[in-house]
């Protein structure tokens, strides 16, 4: 797989993420919810000053400094792992993580928060209310899922070879 193709994956995630967030900020009032399906899928416009699942330090300025710093370090680390990896699956996952991290980093730098807008509700499933998320978050979760499955399968293959 060409290295440039993987950078295109990251760029695509960033562009799609920023495009959808711009549409949401421009067309859905903050806090408004638009029903897509009757029971479990909505678009909404929320500002996430925290991290995943709205984890926060309670102070917007501290959040911004900490999360921008941590994300910037994570992007550098993911880029290093991306360059080091020989596996197409790992490289694809790292490209997805990089795109998601950069997409949310842009929001934090530009606005001081991340725009979240996708809201699923799975009644009686683990949580009272599923967190609102965005394309960047989805890309990161997809990549981590891919890495976990790949690691499990790779572990099984290594065990079978021995």
Where are these regions (language model features)?
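Alpha-helical transmembrane bundles and membrane-interface segments of multipass inner-membrane proteins
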Residues: 1-162
């Amino acid at each position: 797989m060409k290295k440039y193709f993987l950078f295109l994956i990251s760029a695509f995630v960033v562009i799609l993420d920023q495009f959808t967030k711009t549409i949401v900020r421009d067309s859905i009032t903050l806090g408004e919810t638009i029903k897509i399906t009757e029971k479990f899928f909505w678009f909404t416009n929320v500002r996430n000053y925290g991290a995943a699942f709205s984890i926060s330090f309670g102070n917007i300025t501290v959040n911004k400094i900490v999360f921008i710093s941590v994300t910037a370090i994570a992007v550098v680390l993911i880029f290093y792992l991306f360059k080091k990896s020989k596996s197409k699956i790992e490289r694809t996952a790292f490209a997805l993580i990089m795109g998601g991290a950069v997409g949310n980093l842009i929001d934090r730098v530009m606005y001081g928060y991340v725009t979240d807008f996708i809201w699923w509700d799975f009644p009686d499933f683990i949580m009272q209310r599923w967190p609102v998320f965005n394309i960047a978050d989805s890309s990161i979760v997809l990549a981590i899922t891919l890495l976990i499955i790949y690691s499990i399968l790779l572990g099984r293959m290594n065990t079978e070879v021995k």
